[in-house]
From Swiss-Prot:
Tissue: Widely expressed with highest levels in adrenal gland and modest levels in pancreas, testis and uterus.
Organism, scientific name: Homo sapiens (Human)
Origin superkingdom: Eukaryota
Protein's name in the database: ALK and LTK ligand 2
Annotated GO MF terms: cytokine activity; receptor signaling protein tyrosine kinase activator activity; receptor tyrosine kinase binding; transmembrane receptor protein tyrosine kinase activator activity
Signal sequence, renumbered to the chain: 1-24
GO BP annotations, alphabetical order: cell surface receptor protein tyrosine kinase signaling pathway; positive regulation of ERK1 and ERK2 cascade; positive regulation of ERK5 cascade; positive regulation of neuron projection development
Stated family: Belongs to the ALKAL family.
Disulfide cysteine pairs (residue numbers): 111-147, 125-134
Gene this chain is encoded by: ALKAL2
């Protein structure tokens, strides 16, 4: 991506070159002026390179983020170390969120197998976007006839 900086640099070099030739034979040129002019041009080129490399790095990082998104979608996902850090906090938040939505729920020993299957193995209770569905399913399970038998 060489956008507007490349023509600007070319134009600057043309202007500097034309200004140097314009003096011609009227004034004798000293080598120090030529060195100063060359040093100035080199500094300008370095500034432009820094500016373009910063833009290029930003674009590379953006591209890398998109590539990671595709990799995660393909099932590669983040490294196992990152998963270990995320899961415990997520489980606590899941529990708090579901208790907030459902209130205190009681499941009889007969019903605990159904509860564990629902809570740990369904999409609704494992993906945070579906926690409201999970809360609805858990409350329906708690008041179902199978789970209400031991309460009476």
């Amino acid at each position: 991506m060489r956008g507007p900086g490349h023509p600007l640099l070319l134009g600057l070099l043309l202007v500097l070159g034309a200004a140097g030739r314009g003096r011609g034979g009227a004034e004798p040129r000293e080598p120090a002026d030529g060195q100063a002019l060359l040093r100035l041009v080199v500094e300008l080129v370095q500034e432009l390179r820094k500016h373009h490399s910063a833009e290029h790095k930003g674009l590379q990082l953006l591209g890398r983020d998109c590539a990671l998104g595709r990799a995660e979608a393909a099932g590669l996902g983040p490294s196992p170390e990152q998963r270990v850090e995320i899961v415990p906090r997520d489980l606590r938040m899941k529990d708090k969120f579901l208790k907030h939505l459902t209130g205190p729920l009681y499941f009889s020993p007969k019903c605990s197998k159904h509860f564990h299957r629902l809570y740990h193995n369904t999409r609704d209770c494992t993906i945070p976007a579906y926690y409201k569905r999970c809360a609805r399913l858990l409350t329906r399970l708690a008041v179902s006839p199978v789970c209400m038998e031991d309460k009476q």
